[in-house]
Amino acid sequence: MNVHTAGPRHAEKTRHTATPQRVQPSDDLLRLASNVWPRNITRDETGVACIAGNKLTDLAGEYGTPLFVIDEDDFRFRCREIAAAFGGGENVHYAAKAFLCTEIARWIDEEGLSLDVCSGGELAVALHASFPPERISLHGNNKSVAELKDAVKAGVGYIVLDSTTEIERLDAIAGEAGIVQDVLVRLTVGVEAHTHEFIATAHEDQKFGLSVASGAAMAAVRRVFATDNLRLVGLHSHIGSQIFDVAGFELAAHRVIGLLCDIVGEFDPEKTAQLSIVDLGGGLGISYLPDDDPPPIFELAAKLGAIVSNESAAVGLPVPKLMVEPGRAIAGPGTITLYEVGTIKDVDVSATAHRRYVSIDGGMSDNIRTALYDAQYDVRLVSRTSDAPAAPASIVGKHCESGDIVVRDTWVPDDLKPGDLVGVAATGAYCYSLSSRYNMLGRPAVVAVCAGQARLILRRETVDDLLSLEVR
């Protein structure tokens, strides 16, 4: 996989193949693959795509574009499915970093899941939504004193320790508050999952966690046990994101259980009795393209459960509670981004071939993932039908950046024209949450749809919002 860290400079060439690599016949250009698009998406007799009974053309007319459209039933279905697979919602901590607002926090609460936050801002949103603090865990490699104090004051269930400095800091804060805070220690287990370099998080040379191999993790455990105000209840590992192969989780679990065995062997039962949680983090992959084939969630959960059980039995330990932290797997598939087509250019790339650049009214400010990770997406005409032949194209944004590409090397109907609406699938995770105001474009609105109804859950940013931080 090519690494694309920030996009090329102005006037540099962007990477393209001579012709698109994902060849699709023209009669497939309107297909909305069920493994990629929201559960409740259909087309009406005129070819207009609808989600949960809401025409996308109507939503664009009422709320404007770009527009994030969330299939609420899809989101809730995935919450329930993952909770059932992992033995209950208390074992599933939704990763707020994927996408969070107060409405999403309420859905997570209503479906009985727990919540993983990584900043004071995410914690504040959760508390604003009246999310039960005892079902919140706080992560982060550089939590500030203020964030730790806010978490302790709120009464969060767990704080995941990421450094030895944080151990002393949190012990003092908990002592001042007169409580004993439950904590997990985040481990670096040396497993690099088959994922992009920037989203693989458990190899040794990286900013997260404490290394098992170097002894730093065991040293941190000893320091936690030596405190007066921290109670170690589990070990945490996270090996990456968008993972399809369970082998990485198996090796991670083996090393986590190995450390747990060492801890039990070194400390008396009074200290280790409460050490009952193994959190294997998130990273469950989803389909971004029709040919993607991630493992079914129940199959994956059964394999992870068996891994933890077998590893524990092999060293004679009671089976710990298995916890996970899915974000993308819940939020990603049920959301699309709706764009209006603007400028269309045909550019000669050889004596016999050209590429069509289809410009949309959003871009890297609402979806940085293609530029950042070389992400791939499924894009479709959603405002009408078409029987035109396929044309090779790239879907590009309106920003002053040649790397501003949302979908690279795809196919579109040859009659695609300005004013048409296109949808990009599976944009519910790490699109709005990574969005920016680049070129002073306000962030898009977010609309939830369910049973024929649509409601705004995040309004579109306006020029007034863009000017709101100015001091004169």
From Swiss-Prot:
Note the Pfam families from the entry: Orn_Arg_deC_N, Orn_DAP_Arg_deC
Highest taxon in the source lineage = Bacteria
Report the leader peptide range: none
The answer to keyword Lyase applying to this record is yes
Q: Annotated pathway, please?
A: Amino-acid biosynthesis; L-lysine biosynthesis via DAP pathway; L-lysine from DL-2,6-diaminopimelate: step 1/1
User: For the region Disordered, what residue ranges are annotated?
Assistant: 1-23
Family annotation (InterPro entries): Ala_racemase/Decarboxylase_C, DAP_deCOOHase_LysA, De-COase2_C, De-COase2_N, De-COase2_pyr-phos_BS, Orn/DAP/Arg_de-COase, PLP-binding_barrel
Q: Which residues bind substrate?
A: 328, 369, 373, 401, 430
Q: Name one GO biological process term.
A: lysine biosynthetic process via diaminopimelate
User: Which parts form a coiled-coil structure per UniProt?
Assistant: none
Q: Which residues bind pyridoxal 5'-phosphate?
A: 283, 325-328, 430
MF (Gene Ontology)? diaminopimelate decarboxylase activity; pyridoxal phosphate binding
Top-level class of the enzyme under EC nomenclature = lyase
Identify the cofactor(s).
pyridoxal 5'-phosphate
Name the catalytic site residues.
400 (proton donor)
Name the reaction it catalyses: meso-2,6-diaminopimelate + H(+) = L-lysine + CO2
Q: What is its EC number?
A: 4.1.1.20
Q: Which residues carry this modification: N6-(pyridoxal phosphate)lysine?
A: 97
Q: Which UniProt keywords apply?
A: Amino-acid biosynthesis, Decarboxylase, Lyase, Lysine biosynthesis, Pyridoxal phosphate
Q: What does this protein do?
A: Specifically catalyzes the decarboxylation of meso-diaminopimelate (meso-DAP) to L-lysine.
Q: Which family is this protein grouped under?
A: Belongs to the Orn/Lys/Arg decarboxylase class-II family. LysA subfamily.
Relate the assembly described in the record.
Homodimer.
Q: What is this protein called?
A: Diaminopimelate decarboxylase
Q: Which organism is it from?
A: Mycobacterium leprae (strain TN)
Quick one: which gene encodes this? lysA
